[in-house]
């Protein structure tokens, strides 16, 4: 898959793989509510990044901005999962650090798209 040569796509793809493996550590009562929402958002973010990577310069910006909003919402949901103790603080720190890195990459992509 050539698209994984794009660093932000690879980082998000790898995060999903890690996130998927954490599923069984989440209490069952949260697994089918908030966790499922987070997992869906992560897939939507991955889809948005892939879609944006294949668009012309003029069509990228709105897609990237929508993806950024989804990323911010995902961060909020992950924080909520930590606060309700659906995930451990250690898991939260790991996931949040990766999300921050993806956010910086996405912000840079948005900025470079606006400058063109």
Q: Whereabouts are the PLM-identified features?
A:
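Amphipathic alpha-helical assembly/interaction segments
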Residues: 1-116
């Amino acid at each position: 898959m050539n698209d994984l040569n794009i660093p932000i796509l690879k980082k998000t793809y790898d995060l999903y793989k890690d996130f998927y493996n954490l599923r069984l550590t989440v209490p069952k009562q949260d697994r089918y509510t908030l966790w499922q929402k987070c997992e869906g958002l992560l897939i939507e973010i991955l889809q948005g990044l892939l879609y944006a990577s294949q668009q012309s310069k003029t069509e990228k910006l709105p897609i990237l901005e929508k993806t950024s909003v989804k990323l911010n919402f995902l961060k909020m949901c992950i924080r909520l999962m930590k606060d309700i103790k659906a995930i451990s603080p250690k898991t939260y720190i790991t996931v949040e650090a990766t999300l921050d890195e993806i956010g910086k990459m996405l912000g840079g992509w948005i900025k470079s798209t606006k400058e063109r």
